[in-house]
Amino acid sequence: MRIVIEKILLKFFPKLYFGLTRAQDSNDRYLFGFNLIKKNIKDNPSILDVGCGSGNFYSYVNSISKTINYTGIDFDYEKMSKKKFYGKKNFNIISKDLRENWDVGEYDFVWSSEVIEHLFDDKKFFEQLVKSTKKNGYIIITTPYLNSYLSFAKKYGWSIEPSKEEIVGHVKLGYTEQNLVDFAKENSLSLQDIYFISECNNFRSKYFFKLNNGLFCYIFNFLYYMGLFRFKRFSSTKKQINKLNYFSIAAIYKK
């Protein structure tokens, strides 16, 4: 019975399904990407999801338009157990080592969420994103915000030691606004805007990792949807905000 309910929710109410079952910061990022793509979409758009996992972002963008062509790439996708979308005509996932050079064509939108901080050679990785983007196309990335991470780490005793292993850990603790500006300059891109994602108060930041897993995650998600917690999912730098209250930073570039 549970599996049947999950399939119904996934098919007809994907944003609700992921909002209740996934960590809210992940859902915040997906809704951020969904809104930016919806705002800039044209006819029959193509989307490349770099570091796609099991392709959950497909459910969000497919709800914008059924003419979207979605391709995801990630490490060893064939070994993943969650293959919810196999059989969809506009859905494709390819196994690629994201540390290497990969050529999967050019796309209108290249989306990569919380991936770049897992790789030592971030400049090479970003160059691959640019190579995969059509002229006048868009690159959208999200990554932990370094300044807020260090602030939270000081308050709550989080580790400030980067991982020594790529992929499984964060080899970089995060990025700053200047880092995202530099990516644009180094690759001759137009930086459209910088955003901050997942607003946190003292409670959410203190228990951030607990609220992302297991029973605590489900309870928090339910209360979130009931309106007990009210956080901004994302906000542009054009608005007056306290940046240190946001967990992730994001940018949209035009090629």
Regions found by a protein language model. Give the residues of each.
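Conserved class I S-adenosyl-L-methionine
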Residues: 140-162
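Short aromatic-enriched loop/helix-cap "lid" or pocket-rim segments at secondary-structure transitions
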Residues: 83-85, 150-155, 203-209
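Short conserved AdoMet
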Residues: 42, 120, 134
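Residues lining the SAM
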Residues: 113-116, 142
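A short glycine-rich, Lys/Arg-flanked "PGG" loop and its adjoining helix->strand segment in the class I
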Residues: 124-138
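Conserved S-adenosyl-L-methionine
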Residues: 189-200
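Acceptor-substrate binding/catalytic loop of class I
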Residues: 162-179
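Conserved N-terminal segment of class I S-adenosyl-L-methionine
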Residues: 1-105, 109, 113, 123-126, ...
